[in-house]
Amino acid sequence: MGIYWWFEHSENCHTLVLTDAINGHKACPDSPLVEWHQEGLKLDKEFIHTITASERLRTGKWVMDDFDFMKPRSLLKSTVASPRNTGHAEYEHYEWPGDYFTTGEGEMLTRIRMEAQRSPGSRAHGAGHIRTLMTGYTFTLMNHPTAEINQEYLLVQTTLFLRDNAQHSGQDQHFTYVTTFELHPTREVYRPQRTLSKPHTKGPQSAIVTGPVGQEIWTDKYGRVKVQFGWDRYGNNDENSSCWIRVSYPWAGKGFGMIQIPRIGQEVLVDFKNGDPDLPIIVGRTYNQDTMPPWGLPGMASQSGIFSHSLQGGGDQRKHAAL
């Protein structure tokens, strides 16, 4: 949810720091204030000699939407606009599905996505003879001839180059160092880009319907069931083997349609909405050696129909419609 990290190093330990806001950063302990001076000067202090600020084109609006089957009429669309003063700022990015089910979640995620989109639009790059600038810390630049560049920055990337010329002949300095860096103005919200996407499934999977011991059907008011997947090494083939999973039917309307709840022990085919492993849905059933077709095959292959069977305790009662 917009959380990012960096390391703080000390002689005794290395600390992983997590934050989601610019005020979670500290000033560089040894260089909270740094001056700019022209390259080539020999000064008895560390300084920055090169810095260039830039503005980039960024989309100015982020729109997200999703669908919740428990509240199908809910309006979950969320829009956040934060355009920069550049060209193409009126463009928008539309994301579906947003992977949320409440308006509050949608507003938060849309804001974070917009901040991540806007964040790289204002950056500065530079270099200097300074060793104490560290990624994840802030400092304030001073003495630059362009007043707007003199401000507080967050160091989002640093690279330290060291060169030892002690074994070389000549009059060059025996030891030189330069730090290059990328800066983000602290007056702007810093939000890193998403570099990893949510894992997606590939194709449907086979599973066995499960439920409590002694039951033949285990469902809820939505007609959902629970299953155990073949790859699940730790499930116990019971009512806790999975989340509730929706079932697709040939016909479904408001108070009408076709319904047959998959029974415990039946093999079903489970696919995933939008490839999301958190949104399984049963899209079909299939026979296997334990649950064979209702009449002999291939001898009766020409017959088609529907065949029902009574639950436990109801005897061997069957009803069918054959074509």
Task: Enumerate the predicted regions with their spans.
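Amphipathic alpha-helical and helix-coil boundary elements used as assembly
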Residues: 1-323
